[in-house]
């Protein structure tokens, strides 16, 4: 697949992830779309799937090599795990953790919160419990 076609496929991949169109995501990945390629706003397919709570699409993207800890939106949107934890998408959180997401990684350019802080503020106790079981640690606030 040439560079132009790869870019086009990657744009379609972000849209398919947003829409929760797992069959389309699967087809685009088979056609060679880069699972980490962000759209013009810097949004990654994995972030889109995570913020929608689409565990199936997240699983497909991770299996295709998407990096679970990449911040989306050039850092302004945060990580896929923070996005899923924020909305209490426990199934997606489990998929991301199984795919290697760091349960203690704070957003760098966003709020600076960890996935557990997002889940606690939800409040999403089931999601928080899954994160703690995966090794997430509650940070002590600075004075």
What is each of the regions a protein language model found here?
Residues 1-15, 99, 118-143:
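Ankyrin-repeat-protein effector appendages
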Residues 2-40:
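N-terminal segments that cap or nucleate solenoid repeat domains
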Residues 6-15, 38-44, 71-80, 106-114, ...:
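Ankyrin-repeat boundary/"N-cap" motif
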Residues 15-20, 48-54, 83-89, 118-124:
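Ankyrin repeat A-helix N-terminal signature
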Residues 21-29, 54-63, 89-98, 124-133:
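Ankyrin repeat structural motif
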Residues 48-59, 63, 69-74, 78, ...:
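Alpha-helical adaptor scaffolds
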Residues 72, 78, 85, 90-98, ...:
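Short, solvent-exposed interaction modules
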């Amino acid at each position: 697949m040439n560079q132009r076609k790869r870019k086009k496929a990657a744009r379609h991949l972000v849209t398919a992830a947003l829409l929760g169109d797992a069959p389309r995501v699967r087809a685009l990945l088979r056609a060679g779309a880069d699972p980490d390629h962000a759209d013009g706003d810097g949004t990654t397919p994995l972030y889109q799937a995570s913020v929608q709570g689409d565990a199936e699409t997240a699983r497909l993207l991770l299996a295709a090599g998407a990096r679970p800890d990449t911040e989306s939106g050039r850092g302004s949107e945060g990580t896929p795990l923070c996005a899923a934890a924020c909305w209490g998408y426990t199934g997606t959180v489990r998929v991301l953790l199984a795919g290697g997401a760091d349960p203690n990684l704070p957003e760098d350019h966003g709020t600076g919160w960890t996935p557990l802080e997002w889940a606690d503020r939800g409040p999403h106790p089931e999601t928080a419990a899954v994160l703690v079981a995966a090794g997430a640690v509650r940070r002590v606030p600075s004075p």
